[in-house]
Amino acid sequence: MDKSKENCIAGPVKTAIALGDGPKRVLVTQQVPSQNPLSANSGQAQRVLCPSNSSQRVPPQTQKLVSSHKPAQNLKQKQLQATGVPRPASRSLNNTQKSEQPSSSAPGNNSEKELATKQKNEESKKRQWALEDFEIGRPLGKGKFGNVYLAREKQSKFILAIKVLFKAQLEKAGVEHQLRREVEIQSHLRHPNILRLYGYFHDATRVYLILEYAPLGAVYRELQKLSKFDEQRTATYITELADALSYCHSKRVIHRDIKPENLLLGSAGELKIADFGWSVHAPSSRRTTLCGTLDYLPPEMIEGRMHDEKVDLWSLGVLCYEFLVGKPPFEASTYQETYKRISRVEFTFPDFVPEGARDLISRLLKHNPSQRPTLKDVLEHPWIMANSSKPSSSQKSKDSTSKQS
C-alpha cells in the first residue's frame, strides 16, 4: 500500500516528481509491469523485505477503477491544490460505509436534553459516501492490494486521494485485520504531519479509503532525485517526524513501519506520515510479529522479542542516516546479511556525515531499546536545534508562553 505519482482529472498536473538514480534495493520479488492505463509505475527500487510481508510489496494484479462519471475537462491547475478549495462536508465514520465526522466539544452547561437534540440533528446530517460522489483522476501510486487515485468530491470540489483496495486480494492475503486497524487508528489522528483519513466506503468487490492529498508525493522520490539530503532538510524532516511520532505515542499508537516510502510531502513541503497498516495501539504492541521493511526493523523485532514504542526511535535513526547518506545503514546484498548487520548493529559513517548527526544516529541505533533517547531528547538534540528550520510543538508552546509573560 505505498508508492507515488499524467493523466489528470482535467489536464496535466505539474507536480509530478522526476525520478533519479536513487538508493538501490535488493529485489526479492519480480516486478511485473502493469498494462492498466490507470496504473502508475512506481519507479522505485525494492528493499529487502522480511518473510511475513515480502509478498505484499509487489505490483497489484491488473484491475481498473471504473467511475460512472467522466472527469471534468477544464479544471485549472490551482484547483488541484487541496489548500485552495473547501474540504468535503464532515461525515461520520462508523462500522458501515460512512465517513468520519469530527467531534465537536459540547458546551459544559448543556443539559442532557439539549445534548440529545444536538446529537439527533447531527445524526440527520450524516450520509454514506459512494463512488458516484467523486470524480476519479490520474493514479498517484500502486501497491499489492490496489491503487491510489487523485479524486475530487463533486459537491464541494475538494481535491483528495482515494485508495482503492480489492477485497479478494485482502482476503487471500489474510490482512483484513490490518486494514481495519489502519482505518481505526489513522481516522482518529489529528496532526499537521500525519496524513488525514477522512473516511471510507465499500462496494461488492472493493474498499475505498478517502485520504488527504499530498501534492508533492513521497519523500522516497525526492531522495531518489537528489541522492541525499543536506543537514537542514534532514534535521527539519526529523523534527517533523519526531513531533508526529510524539503525538502518536501520546495516543498509545506506534507506527512500526517508518520509511521514506511511507512519508509524503504536503503542498508547503511539510512531511506527512502515511500508511498506518502496520501500526498498533501500544497496549497490544508487545508482540513478536515480524512486519514492515527489514532495513528499518530494530533488533528486538527481527529477533522475535517483545517490543514497544522504542521501535519507532530505531527507525528514526535509520531514516536520519539514509537522508544524509542516501542508503540505509544496514543495507546488504542479501536478506541474511542485512539481518546479521541489524542484529549486531554493524554500520559505518561516510566521512561527509557531520559529527552532530553521527552522535544523534549512534544514540538512536542502540541494540537495547531502553538505551535509546526519547523523542523529546531527539527534538532537543544540539544538531537538530542548530539545523532544523521548524520548531517542534513543544518549542512553539515555550515560545508562546514566554511571549505572553
Swiss-Prot record:
Modified residues (Phosphoserine): S42, S52, S343
Phosphothreonine: modified positions: T288, T289
One GO molecular-function entry: ATP binding
Catalytic activity, as annotated: L-seryl-[protein] + ATP = O-phospho-L-seryl-[protein] + ADP + H(+); L-threonyl-[protein] + ATP = O-phospho-L-threonyl-[protein] + ADP + H(+)
Active site: D257 (proton acceptor)
Protein kinase domain: residues covered: 134-384
Enzyme Commission no: 2.7.11.1
Residue ranges, compositional bias (Basic and acidic residues): 111-127, 396-405
Record-listed cross-link Glycyl lysine isopeptide (Lys-Gly) (interchain with G-Cter in SUMO2), residues: K259
InterPro entries documented for this protein: Aur-like, AURKA, Kinase-like_dom_sf, Prot_kinase_dom, Protein_kinase_ATP_BS, Ser/Thr_kinase_AS
GO-annotated cellular components: basolateral plasma membrane; centriole; centrosome; chromosome passenger complex; cilium; cytoplasm; kinetochore; neuron projection
Entry PTM: Activated by phosphorylation at Thr-289; this brings about a change in the conformation of the activation segment. Phosphorylation at Thr-289 varies during the cell cycle and is highest during M phase. Autophosphorylated at Thr-289 upon TPX2 binding. Thr-289 can be phosphorylated by several kinases, including PAK and PKA. Protein phosphatase type 1 (PP1) binds AURKA and inhibits its activity by dephosphorylating Thr-289 during mitosis. Phosphorylation at Ser-343 decreases the kinase activity. PPP2CA controls degradation by dephosphorylating Ser-52 at the end of mitosis. Ubiquitinated by the E3 ubiquitin-protein ligase complex SCF(FBXL7) during mitosis, leading to its degradation by the proteasome. Ubiquitinated by CHFR, leading to its degradation by the proteasome. Ubiquitinated by the anaphase-promoting complex (APC), leading to its degradation by the proteasome. Ubiquitinated by the CUL3-KLHL18 ligase leading to its activation at the centrosome which is required for initiating mitotic entry. Ubiquitination mediated by CUL3-KLHL18 ligase does not lead to its degradation by the proteasome.
Compartments (UniProt record): Cytoplasm, Cytoskeleton, Microtubule organizing center, Centrosome; Cytoplasm, Cytoskeleton, Spindle pole; Cytoplasm, Cytoskeleton, Microtubule organizing center, Centrosome, Centriole; Cell projection, Neuron projection
Coiled-coil spans in chain: none
GO biological process, one term: meiotic spindle organization
Annotated segments matching region Disordered: 32-127, 385-405
Keywords, alphabetical: ATP-binding, Cell cycle, Cell division, Cell membrane, Cell projection, Cytoplasm, Cytoskeleton, Isopeptide bond, Kinase, Membrane, Microtubule, Mitosis, Nucleotide-binding, Phosphoprotein, Serine/threonine-protein kinase, Transferase, Ubl conjugation
Annotated ATP binding sites: K144, K163, E212, Y213, A214, E261, N262, D275
Region Activation segment, annotated ranges: 281-294
SMART domains named among the record's database cross-references: S_TKc
Function according to Swiss-Prot or TrEMBL: Mitotic serine/threonine kinase that contributes to the regulation of cell cycle progression. Associates with the centrosome and the spindle microtubules during mitosis and plays a critical role in various mitotic events including the establishment of mitotic spindle, centrosome duplication, centrosome separation as well as maturation, chromosomal alignment, spindle assembly checkpoint, and cytokinesis. Required for normal spindle positioning during mitosis and for the localization of NUMA1 and DCTN1 to the cell cortex during metaphase. Required for initial activation of CDK1 at centrosomes.
Assembly and binders: Part of a complex composed of NEDD9, AURKA and CTTN; within the complex NEDD9 acts as a scaffold protein and is required for complex formation. Identified in a complex with AUNIP and NIN. Interacts with FBXL7. Interacts with CPEB1, JTB, TACC1, TPX2, PPP2CA, as well as with the protein phosphatase type 1 (PP1) isoforms PPP1CA, PPP1CB and PPP1CC. Also interacts with its substrates ARHGEF2, BORA, KIF2A, PARD3, and p53/TP53. Interaction with BORA promotes phosphorylation of PLK1. Interacts with CIMAP3. Interacts with GADD45A, competing with its oligomerization.
Record family assignment: Belongs to the protein kinase superfamily. Ser/Thr protein kinase family. Aurora subfamily.
Record protein name field: Aurora kinase A
Protein's organism: Canis lupus familiaris (Dog)
